[in-house]
Amino acid sequence: LAILLLLKPFAPEGTTPISAGMVAVMIGFNLILGPLGEELGWRGLFQEHLNQRIGWLEASLLIGAIWLVWHLPLWTIDSPHAQIALPLFAAHCMLYSVIIGAAYTISGGSILPAILIHLTVNLAANFSIFAGFKDPNAWFSASLVPLLLLALGAISLVYFRTGQLGVRWLQV
């Protein structure tokens, strides 16, 4: 959401007012349809198992690729996702997966940070429409570099907090 606030002045179109009720509905809707169920599987089941086998970073990238495939059917129906350039969405999936995987690893395996980050990601994409990014590609493009920096910061944070590079074959 901080990225959204930083990029808001660069939005191509004017803002749209949003009510507190609309925000509450969006939070509930987004929580139930995405982060709760998905993160129970992605982090609750896969991340820990894969972390032990291939390292947290490789596990996060693999989960990011699976996450992308999981969302591909949304491009075959009339949905907001169908308007997003697939390479942009793929980059977001991979970067978010690294950030979420880092939070999961630093937290000692709690899925709560994963759920909260995933929820925030979904809400930022939804709120970007109200902030003037009517074309989802504008938001996905504008937020790509800040996300890359956050992902690199997350990798560094895991390394400095745990000593884990996250890539099994690089471990000495």
Q: Could you tell me what each predicted segment is?
A:
Residues 29-39, 97-98, 148-161:
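Hydrophobic cores of alpha-helical transmembrane segments in multi-pass inner/ER membrane proteins
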Residues 1-5, 65-74, 119-128:
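Aromatic-anchored segments of alpha-helical transmembrane domains
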Residues 112, 117-172:
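C-terminal membrane module of polytopic membrane proteins
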Residues 13-28, 77-91, 142-144:
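Juxtamembrane helix-entry segments on the extracytoplasmic side of multipass membrane proteins
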Residues 7-18, 47, 75-82, 130-138:
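Membrane-interface helix termini and inter-helical loops of multi-pass transporters
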Residues 90-102:
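Hydrophobic alpha-helical segments embedded in the membrane of multi-pass proteins
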Residues 37-64, 78, 102-110:
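Membrane-interface helix/loop boundary segments of multi-pass membrane proteins
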Residues 19-20, 54-58, 85-86, 107-112, ...:
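Membrane-helix interface segments
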